[in-house]
Design a protein with these regions (language model features):
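Short, flexible coil/linker segments at or flanking structured domains
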Residues: 16, 64-68, 73, 112, ...
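Alpha-helical scaffold segments that mediate packing/assembly in large oligomeric complexes
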Residues: 1-64
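Ordered core of a single globular domain
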Residues: 47-96, 104
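Sequence/fold signature of self-assembling virion shell proteins
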Residues: 25-52, 87-192
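Internal mixed-charge
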Residues: 2-4, 82, 126
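Short glycine-rich, low-complexity/disordered patches
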Residues: 5-14, 72-76, 100-108
Length: 192
C-alpha cells in the first residue's frame, strides 16, 4: 500500500507524507495532469467528480476525449481510487445496463478491476494510491512505467525481531520512480 501510494502521489523535491523520504521524481498523479504538456483534460460532465447516476456517461466522455491512436488499445484502463471505483460499480449496477454483470468485479491484492460495459478492451481499476482522490485517469496501462534499483536490496535490507511488540520488522531502502511513455495518450479529469 505504501508503494502504491508513493507511485501515484509522489511530488519531486517534496517530503512524502508520513515518512522521511524526499521524492526525487513525480508520481503518476502529477505526471498525468493538466499541468503536464500534451495530457488531455476531460471537459463537461467528464471533468466533474464521478457520481453513480452519471458514471457511465462520464467514463465514455473521457474515452471520446482520448487520442484516437489508443482508443482501441487492448489495455486501455481507467485508474481511480477505491471509493470512486465503488461509485462507478454502484452506478453501472443501478443504471441496470443489460450487459453489465456486477459479479465480474475482481479483487487482485488490494486492487479492484471490472470491465467497462460496451468496451471489450477497457477496464476500470480501483487502487490504493488514489484512495483519497476524485482523480480518474484513462490511458494504456502498458505505457506507464515503474522503475527501481532492486539490485541494491541485499545491502539495504534489515530484518529483526522486536521483543516489545512481539513482531518481526523489516526495513528496505531502495529507489522507486515512475514515468509515462507518451503523455498525449492520457486523459485526466484533473480533480484533486
Amino acid at each position: 500500500q505504501s508503494n502504491d501510494d508513493f507511485i501515484w502521489n509522489a511530488v519531486a523535491g517534496a517530503e512524502f507524507p508520513g515518512s522521511t523520504v524526499t521524492a526525487e521524481a513525480d508520481g503518476f498523479k502529477t505526471l498525468i495532469s493538466g499541468s503536464t504538456a500534451n495530457v488531455r483534460v476531460a471537459t463537461g460532465t467528464s471533468a466533474t467528480a464521478i457520481t453513480g447516476s452519471t458514471a457511465y456517461t462520464q467514463l465514455t466522455g473521457m474515452i471520446a476525449a482520448a487520442d484516437p491512436n489508443i482508443v482501441d488499445a487492448s489495455d486501455l484502463t481507467f485508474f481511480c481510487g477505491i471509493s470512486v471505483f465503488q461509485r462507478i460499480v454502484n452506478g453501472l449496477t443501478t443504471q441496470n445496463l443489460f450487459h453489465f454483470d456486477p459479479t465480474t468485479v475482481k479483487s487482485r491484492g488490494g486492487f479492484y478491476e471490472v470491465p467497462l460495459p460496451g468496451y471489450p478492451n477497457v477496464v476500470i481499476v480501483g487502487g490504493w494510491g488514489l484512495r483519497s482522490s476524485e482523480r480518474v485517469i484513462l490511458g494504456p496501462a502498458s505505457d506507464m512505467y515503474v522503475g527501481t534499483d532492486l539490485t541494491s536490496d541485499t545491502s539495504n535490507y534489515q530484518l529483526w525481531y522486536d521483543i516489545n511488540s512481539d513482531t518481526i520488522k523489516y526495513r528496505l531502502r531502495n529507489k522507486l520512480g515512475t514515468q509515462v511513455g507518451h503523455a498525449h495518450y492520457y486523459v485526466s479529469n484533473d480533480l484533486a
